[in-house]
Regions:
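Buried hydrophobic positions in well-ordered alpha/beta secondary-structure cores of metabolic enzymes
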Residues: 5-7, 33, 62, 76, ...
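Short beta-strand segments
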Residues: 9, 79, 135-141, 164, ...
Length: 340
């Protein structure tokens, strides 16, 4: 039995900081940073927002779109590298807050920026095995970066959630056709226990890390799916910046039109575990029945999860976010980040 996405949701903070503001603070060339990264601004979590609150809001919306009772959900997996507690599961908090079935499989997942897609794979497997009828997979993060580090320009906050169930369900929106993972031991990015900020290996994060893993996962999923790039309608690659996914897409022959709906990084930033899942959530609003979707995540350390999906009906528009976008200065930004 195949699984499908029945509903989806997302939560993105309304606060932003512009790339120019960060660059000016550190006396760097703002235009060079914008052109180099392809990111003009990023989300900033407010004082009352964290990985749990973002995950909860996205999950609540996903249940609403799926048009099911939260008590039907018997598995909740939350992928993140910024869980609020070192010991106290975000997944259990989310399951309780959403009033899911208390006989619920719950776990917090970590694999850098691909923990959210790992959650999707686990729920997909449980549904295929007929162990559960409905599960909730969430990717959520309030990403950290050392002040003055290159990561500060992109490390952002957000969450995406997916209610999954049998592909035979009347409310099935998008079927999961195939999935695979490609994993190695590649030390491109890490945060040691007890450390406040992650470290990274600079340019090493590119070719032997992101590009190698995303290429291999993409080649593998296209091969097992017996599908060519031109037969894909929508493609989402992990977006640590705008340049990396654009480059790998060009290598495979994907067009800007195939990427446009899920390419959110220029004005959102890299939301880590929520990054490619948020791209998918945007695509699920625009895609049409029978459209084919390719999703490839990347998590440092390192690995990529790849998915082929098929839309079973036209996409569903989420309610518009009516909050006003507010831009903060660097001092305000650092104060908010310190609160997390």
């Amino acid at each position: 039995m195949q699984s499908a996405i029945l509903g989806f949701g997302m939560s993105i903070p309304s606060l932003r900081i512009k790339t120019e503001e960060i660059a000016n603070t550190w006396k760097q060339d703002a235009n060079a940073m914008i052109n180099g990264l392809g990111v003009t601004e990023k989300t900033v979590p407010d004082a009352g927002e964290d990985t749990f609150t973002l995950a909860f809001e996205a999950g609540r919306q996903a249940i609403e779109i799926a048009d099911i009772q939260s008590s039907q959900v018997s598995a909740v997996f939350v992928g993140s590298e910024s869980h609020p507690y070192a010991v106290k599961p975000t997944s259990g908090m989310v399951a309780a807050a959403l009033e899911c079935d208390p006989f619920c499989h719950c776990a917090d997942l970590e694999f850098a920026c691909k923990a959210g897609t790992a959650a999707i794979q686990i729920v997909d497997s449980m549904i295929r095995a007929k162990q559960i009828s409905h599960g909730l997979a969430i990717g959520a993060d309030c990403a950290q970066a050392k002040p003055g580090d290159a990561l500060e320009y992109t490390a952002a906050a957000g969450a995406a959630a997916f209610i999954m169930g049998p592909a035979t369900a009347k409310n099935a929106l998008c079927r999961i056709d195939q999935t695979l993972s490609f994993t190695t031991d590649t030390p491109d990015f890490w945060r040691a226990n007890g450390k406040a900020h992650p470290e990274h290996a600079g340019r090493f994060t590119g070719e032997p890390a992101y590009f190698h893993h995303v290429r291999e996962a993409t080649k593998g999923i296209l091969e097992i799916g017996s599908i060519k790039p031109e037969e894909i309608d929508h493609v989402i690659f992990h977006m640590p910046n705008a340049k990396f996914p654009s480059r790998v897409a060009k290598e495979f022959g994907f067009t800007k039109e195939q990427m446009e709906h899920g390419f959110i990084v220029p004005t959102v930033g890299n939301t880590y575990s929520a990054c490619s899942p948020l791209g998918l959530a945007h695509v699920l609003q625009q895609a049409k029945k029978d459209d084919r979707i390719l999703l490839v995540s990347y998590g440092s350390g390192a690995g990529s999860d790849a998915f082929l999906m098929t839309m079973m009906k036209d996409g569903v528009k989420l309610a518009p976010d009516t909050r006003e976008t507010t831009y903060v200065n660097y001092t305000e930004y650092q104060s908010l980040i310190a609160a997390h």
